[in-house]
Curated annotation (Swiss-Prot):
It comes from the Eukaryota. Component of the cap-binding complex (CBC), which binds cotranscriptionally to the 5'-cap of pre-mRNAs and is involved in various processes such as pre-mRNA splicing, translation regulation, nonsense-mediated mRNA decay, RNA-mediated gene silencing (RNAi) by microRNAs (miRNAs) and mRNA export. The CBC complex is involved in mRNA export from the nucleus, leading to the recruitment of the mRNA export machinery to the 5'-end of mRNA and to mRNA export in a 5' to 3' direction through the nuclear pore. GO terms for biological process: 7-methylguanosine mRNA capping; mRNA export from nucleus; nuclear-transcribed mRNA catabolic process, nonsense-mediated decay; regulation of mRNA processing; regulation of translation; regulatory ncRNA-mediated gene silencing; RNA splicing. One of its GO terms (cellular component) is cytoplasm. This is Nuclear cap-binding protein subunit 1-A. It is found in: Nucleus; Cytoplasm. Residues 641-714 form a coiled coil. Residues 1-24, 664-687 are annotated as: Disordered. One of its GO terms (molecular function) is mRNA binding. It holds the Pfam family MIF4G_like. Component of the nuclear cap-binding complex (CBC), a heterodimer composed of ncbp1/cbp80 and ncbp2/cbp20 that interacts with m7GpppG-capped RNA. Component of an alternative nuclear cap-binding complex (CBC) composed of ncbp1/cbp80 and ncbp3. Residues 28-240 form the MIF4G domain.
């Protein structure tokens, strides 16, 4: 009653209260907008904007200090491309309010520890770099920053830790030095020399078995593919030699030097790196992607050399822009093209190199592949007079280096290039690539052109490809995507099952029931069964052939027709695929019908897995079967296999998630029961949930067993075919390094790299059963390289 009366009597008061509570929210939103947008397009200078914003924030500190702290920590972590802008802002605030500066430093250290514990190492790097830049702004005392770096480098002395842990701490130090190296050397040169000596000693004894599995190209010319720490070390060494002078970092705090140098500084608290645990997941090592040098951009500004720190700073800033804005291509493209100091560098070349560097990054790109495609299209629209030419030059370079390019990266190049062409009327000067026509069709260049045309056909239609590509390329044209029905021609009437296929086709057209179709199929003799074998066997290849050929031919009009046919006759498919041989033969027949239409094969296999007509292991066995050997290096085959693995992984994850959610529900029930002793029903409610958990636990174990078996099948098949090749070459005194061998070995690497997080669970099994010491070193090295990624 009292609540209702209060509401009734004070309607006006309540509205007034709502306004009062909304005002702080409006002010907080305004503060967030002001901070996040500082340094963007404005009629006044950056310096005056920063000074004005510092004044606004200082005035709001009494009421909104915690909110301001939270926003500044947020931008330090998630807007690294504007780091020096925000470090200057913090410097100005510290000069006006010393206590706030101290609280901000403490908050940043807390954030850093939390970020490391959450395995968010890329964000942690930005926090370390931000702290180091605060030394330049007279917020943090240089000796305490040096002490933090010493504790970071001390991690290299820890025992029984993976190398990737030490790598990250060394990288965090080295990657901060372009910003703060000069200041630290002026104040603490002896200590800094000691830190760099420790880093040098560590880098010399690091194992680098992982490098070759991460390289885009196997050749070191024209540009070496350097390991990321080695490259950064060379850049820092050159920077030190140049007395820490660089010309590409925006340093707005220099304009406020007279104000900032009067400010009191803070000492960082002693920092102990969080210890290594079983849950720690460190960043995978990288190889620095290099595509251009100063000779490729002869006009305009000169591109910095690969070992100049300016190259690192520019690339790092462009990567930061991609990381911050990748979800919105228009904003991302605009931010890239409005890069500060863009007139001092060949910006388009840097942008294209950085984007391709991310697209080709191994094991996986930072973002989905299609993001890079749409971003490059947007950049071409914004810079139609210059960027398309740089992109064409890059495409030409990639094509000329296909022979030494990693097969995984060739796949990504095919996907990007075909998608890009589809947005520009498929315009390309194909005659420039006519050199591929004189090569063996199994070589990378003709294979690349063939797969690009295949992909372009998916994005248009067959006749369009024939119209736009010169007739001289006819050997690489995609086949006309029509089905091959072996029972459709009367000249094949002598084929076993021909008459049944004709009958079956008519009955399906007349909407026969499953029972009627079963009756027709049961009369088909089994070629695997002897006349005197009364028991018979369940697997009848001819029965499968007649049914699948006839049905897929009738449903050949479109993907939708094919899907409807699989759904309508699902029970018959299930009956025919009871055995492993049956599943395998269904896949063989589907391939025979649609061998001229790889996309149809891919979507049919996908649908058959989803509807459980075939299982994932059957698909793996089919891919490695002799019938598919002539298509083994084709793009679509690996598209199917990786799609199959992803489905299996998602299936396991889905059941694991169900199990976790059910366990959480049970835990909540227990908590509720403990707080309510009189609830007699709660004990009875536990029963069904506990039974459900038991069932889900069994399902998880079964699914994980299937998953492990799938990887065992795949790796076993790889080992078999690679071993056969190696033995054949050794016996015949033939060179091992054929185009097929390169492709096959790199496809094995691809399985490891694309599914590395899942495969990590089964490392012991793989090492004990398959990748043993007795295995040929050509194959075993791939496994060892994979292990080195997290060692």
């Amino acid at each position: 009653m009292s609540r209702r009366r209060h509401s009734d009597e004070n309607d006006g008061g309540q509205a007034h209260k709502r306004r009062k509570t909304s005002e702080p929210l409006e002010i907080e939103d305004r503060l967030e907008s002001l901070i996040c947008r500082v340094g963007e397009k404005s009629t006044s200078s950056l310096e005056s904007n920063l000074e004005g914003l510092a004044g606004v924030l200082e005035a709001d500190l009494p009421n909104y200090k915690s909110k301001i702290l939270r926003i500044l920590c947020f931008v330090a972590r998630l807007l690294p491309e504007k780091m020096s802008v925000y470090s200057t802002l913090v410097g100005l605030l510290n000069a006006r309010n010393y206590n706030f500066g101290g609280e901000f430093v403490e908050a940043m250290i807390r954030h850093l520890k939390e970020t490391i514990k959450l395995n968010a190492y890329s964000e942690a790097v930005y926090l370390v770099r931000f702290l180091s830049d605060l030394v330049n702004c007279h917020v943090i005392a240089a000796p305490s920053m040096v002490a933090m770096f010493e504790s970071f480098v001390g991690v290299t002395q820890e025992e029984d830790i993976p190398q990737v842990r030490s790598d990250w701490y060394v990288y965090a130090v080295l990657s901060s030095l372009p910003w703060v190296g000069k200041e630290l050397y002026e104040k603490k040169d002896v200590e800094m020399d000691r830190i760099l000596s420790q880093i040098e000693a560590y880098l010399k004894q690091r194992q680098k078995l992982h490098v070759s599995i991460l390289q885009v190209w196997s050749a070191e010319k024209p540009h070496p593919q350097e390991e990321y720490l080695d490259c950064l070390w060379a850049q820092i060494q050159k920077l030190k030699k140049d007395r820490w002078q660089e010309r590409h970092i925006l340093r707005p705090y220099l304009a406020f030097d007279s104000v900032l140098c009067e400010a009191l500084q803070h000492n960082l608290p002693p920092f102990t790196p969080p210890p290594h645990t079983e849950d720690s997941v460190y960043p995978v090592p990288r190889v620095v992607f290099r595509m251009f040098d100063y000779t490729d951009a002869p006009e305009g500004p000169v591109m910095p050399g690969s070992h100049s720190v300016e190259r690192f700073v520019i690339e790092e800033n462009l990567h930061c822009i991609l990381k911050s804005h990748w979800r919105e291509r228009k904003t991302c493209a605009a931010q890239l093209l409005s890069y500060p100091e863009k007139n001092k560098i060949p910006l388009n070349y840097h942008i294209v190199e950085v984007i391709f560097g991310e697209l080709f990054q191994l094991p996986t790109p930072p973002h989905i592949d299609v993001m890079y495609t749409t971003l490059l299209i947007e950049l071409c629209k914004l810079q139609p007079g210059s960027l398309p030419q740089v992109l064409a030059q890059a495409s030409e370079m990639l094509y000329t280096r296909l022979d030494t390019m990693n097969t995984i990266c060739i796949d990504r190049f095919i996907n990007w290039f075909s998608h890009h062409l589809s947005n520009f009327q498929f315009r390309w000067n194909w005659e420039d690539w006519a050199d591929c026509l004189s090569q063996d069709l199994n070589k990378p260049k003709p294979q690349f052109v063939r797969e690009v045309l295949e992909k372009c056909m998916r994005l248009s239609y067959h006749q369009r490809i024939l119209d736009i590509v010169p007739a001289t390329f006819s050997a690489l044209y995609p086949a006309s995507p029509s089905c091959v029905f072996k029972y459709g021609d009367e000249s094949n009437s002598a084929l076993p099952g021909y008459s049944v296929a004709v009958t079956l086709t008519n009955e399906i057209k007349n909407k026969a029931s499953d029972k009627e179709i079963f009756n027709i199929l049961k009369d088909i003799p089994n070629p695997n069964q002897d006349d005197d074998d009364d028991e018979g066997i369940s697997f009848n290849p001819l029965k499968i052939e007649v049914f699948v050929q006839s049905l897929l031919n009738l449903a050949s009009k479109s993907f939708s027709h094919a899907f409807s046919a699989l759904a309508k006759f699902h029970d018959i498919f299930k009956a025919l695929s009871e055995s492993d041989e049956g599943k395998l033969h269904i896949l063989r027949v589907a391939y025979d019908v649609w061998k001229n239409h790889p996309q149809m094969i891919a979507v049919l296999v996908d649908k058959m897995i989803r509807t459980q007509i075939v299982d994932c292991a059957a698909v793996a066995n089919w891919i490695f079967s002799p019938e598919l050997s002539h298509d083994f290096t084709r793009f679509y085959i690996w598209e199917i296999l990786h799609s199959t693995i992803r489905k299996m992984n998602k299936h396991v994850q889905k059941i694991q998630k169900e199990l976790e959610e059910t366990k959480q529900r049970l835990a909540k029930q227990h908590k509720h029961r403990d707080s309510d002793d009189n609830d007699e029903d709660s004990g009875r409610k536990d029963g069904p949930l506990e039974e459900q958990i038991e069932r889900l636990q069994e399902k998880v174990e079964s699914a994980q067993s299937e998953q492990k078996n799938l990887f065992l099948v795949i790796f076993q098949r790889f080992i078999m075919i690679l071993t056969e090749h190696l033995v054949r070459c050794e016996t015949g005194a033939i060179d091992v390094n054929t185009a097929w061998y390169k492709n096959c070995r790199e496809r094995l690497q691809q399985i490891f790299l694309q599914h590395h997080q899942t495969i990590q669970q089964y490392m012991v099994t793989l090492e004990n059963l398959l990748f043993t010491a007795e295995l040929d070193h050509h194959i075993l090295t791939v496994f060892q390289q994979f292990c080195a990624l997290q060692s």
